[in-house]
């Protein structure tokens, strides 16, 4: 039975092969692949070449270069021989198995979340937040209630304090503003700008009773000399 050329080449896959080129260079590497044009792929390849000395008396010296992965064209190939057997660790899986015990240097994927038995990190004392139930408003104040209930409760709590002044809710009425002595009563217009308001009677005394007899009411000009003034309020004028 005749063995084909491709079958012979397949038998030497993963072998260390020595390839000699037309220019005399020698490539030694692990044989990985080929095609019908005898293009070869060698990995971990080393190049060896002989350099002729300038002086004929000196011998030729051999130079080695490390190349790594090489694609060798078949048109430059002269001969190909076996240099050594394939490495022994070719069939060993380099990826750790699922059940294998992990050691230093074995990479593992980081899981999401915090393990169940891991202790929770504690914040420093100065950066920790307030403890629930200690400090801050009470739960009754923070509980949502109807409109006006919270304001009424706050006003009742404030009024229970001894000596606390009465507080008025903004927008719902407040204490009447203080009235000055010369300000007009509510609903009446004041004097024009630049004019001094008339002087009224003292506080607590009804108007018209604090003025002396014969004096006109406040805001009226006195009568000319020789004429009697108007009678005081409550008295009839004299008959002519």
From Swiss-Prot:
UniProt superkingdom: Eukaryota
PROSITE patterns associated with the record: SM
All copies of domain Sm, residue ranges: 4-86
Keywords associated with the record: Cytoplasm, mRNA processing, mRNA splicing, Nucleus, Repeat, Ribonucleoprotein, RNA-binding, Spliceosome
Residue span of region Disordered: 164-240
Gene Ontology biological-process entries: mRNA splicing, via spliceosome; spliceosomal snRNP assembly
Pfam families documented for this protein: LSM
This protein's GO CC annotations: catalytic step 2 spliceosome; cytoplasm; cytosol; methylosome; nucleoplasm; nucleus; SMN-Sm protein complex; telomerase holoenzyme complex
Signal peptide boundaries: none
Database matches in InterPro entries: LSM_dom_sf, Sm, Sm_dom_euk/arc, snRNP-assoc_SmB/SmN
Repeat region (Sequence), residues: 175-181, 191-196, 216-221, 222-228, 230-236
GO molecular function terms listed in the Swiss-Prot or TrEMBL record: snRNP binding; telomerase RNA binding
Comp. bias regions, Pro residues: 173-205, 214-240
Region annotation (Repeat-rich region) ranges: 175-236
Compartments where found: Cytoplasm, Cytosol; Nucleus
Keyword RNA-binding: yes
Role noted for this protein: Plays a role in pre-mRNA splicing as a core component of the spliceosomal U1, U2, U4 and U5 small nuclear ribonucleoproteins (snRNPs), the building blocks of the spliceosome. Component of both the pre-catalytic spliceosome B complex and activated spliceosome C complexes. As a component of the minor spliceosome, involved in the splicing of U12-type introns in pre-mRNAs. As part of the U7 snRNP it is involved in histone pre-mRNA 3'-end processing.
Subunit composition and interactions: Core component of the spliceosomal U1, U2, U4 and U5 small nuclear ribonucleoproteins (snRNPs), the building blocks of the spliceosome. Most spliceosomal snRNPs contain a common set of Sm proteins, SNRPB, SNRPD1, SNRPD2, SNRPD3, SNRPE, SNRPF and SNRPG that assemble in a heptameric protein ring on the Sm site of the small nuclear RNA to form the core snRNP. Component of the U1 snRNP. The U1 snRNP is composed of the U1 snRNA and the 7 core Sm proteins SNRPB, SNRPD1, SNRPD2, SNRPD3, SNRPE, SNRPF and SNRPG, and at least three U1 snRNP-specific proteins SNRNP70/U1-70K, SNRPA/U1-A and SNRPC/U1-C.
Family: Belongs to the snRNP SmB/SmN family.
Name of the protein: Small nuclear ribonucleoprotein-associated protein B'
């Amino acid at each position: 039975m005749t063995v084909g050329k491709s079958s012979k080449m397949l038998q030497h896959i993963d072998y260390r092969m020595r390839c000699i080129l037309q220019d005399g260079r020698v490539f030694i590497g692990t044989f990985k692949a080929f095609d019908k044009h005898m293009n070869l792929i060698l990995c971990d390849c080393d190049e060896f070449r002989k350099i002729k000395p300038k002086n004929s008396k000196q011998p030729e010296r051999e130079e080695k270069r490390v190349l790594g992965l090489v694609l060798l064209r078949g048109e430059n190939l002269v001969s190909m021989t076996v240099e050594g057997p394939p490495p022994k660790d070719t069939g060993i899986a380099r990826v750790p198995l699922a059940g294998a015990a992990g050691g230093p240097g074995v990479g593992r994927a980081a899981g999401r979340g915090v393990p169940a038995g891991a202790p929770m990190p504690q914040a420093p004392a100065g950066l920790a937040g307030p403890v629930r139930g200690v400090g801050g408003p009470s739960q009754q104040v923070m509980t949502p209630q109807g409109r006006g209930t919270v304001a009424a409760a706050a006003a009742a709590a404030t009024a229970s304090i001894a000596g606390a002044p009465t507080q008025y809710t903004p927008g719902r009425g407040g204490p009447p503003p203080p009235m000055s002595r010369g300000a007009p009563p509510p609903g009446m217009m004041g004097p024009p700008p630049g004019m001094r308001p008339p002087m009224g009677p003292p506080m607590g005394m009804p108007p018209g009773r604090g003025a002396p007899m014969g004096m006109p009411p406040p805001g009226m000009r006195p009568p000319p000399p020789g004429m009697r003034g108007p009678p005081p309020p409550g008295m009839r004028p004299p008959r002519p």
